């Protein structure tokens, strides 16, 4: 069994102390940059990298792990804390089907991406969480 050990925490643009604005492209770029820092700059092999996402970050994290798996270089594990099935599903749940589909793209279909991930997956989700439905 491979021992996984690497954890890199980052804020997405427009969240926390990070500058910039949050949009799909900036979040995807930050996710890709975080994986590159871990693997290329710090020398962490993908087979020892744990990809972690919390709340809004679970979609980009699942997409990154699916992309790595597609390239036959999956991470060691994927951990999703308070995930959602997709941003569009969340918007539909909160705003209704017509408005949700109109306003929100299907950029991070977490549930669909999980089917493509080829590493162990840990889902952490409270059964009373009314914000992030999974």
Across the structure, where does each feature detected by a protein language model lie?
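Short beta-strand/loop motif that positions the catalytic acidic residue
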Residues: 116-117, 122-129
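Conserved alpha/beta-hydrolase
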Residues: 4-19
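Conserved alpha/beta-hydrolase "acid-adjacent" motif
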Residues: 130-134
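Hydrophobic/aromatic beta-strand patches that form the interior of the parallel beta-sheet core
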Residues: 8, 79, 122-124
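Alpha/beta-hydrolase active-site loop
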Residues: 21-43, 63, 112
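Primarily recognizes the serine-hydrolase "nucleophile elbow" in alpha/beta-hydrolase
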Residues: 37-41, 46-95
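Active-site nucleophile elbow and catalytic-triad environment of alpha/beta-hydrolase enzymes
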Residues: 99-119
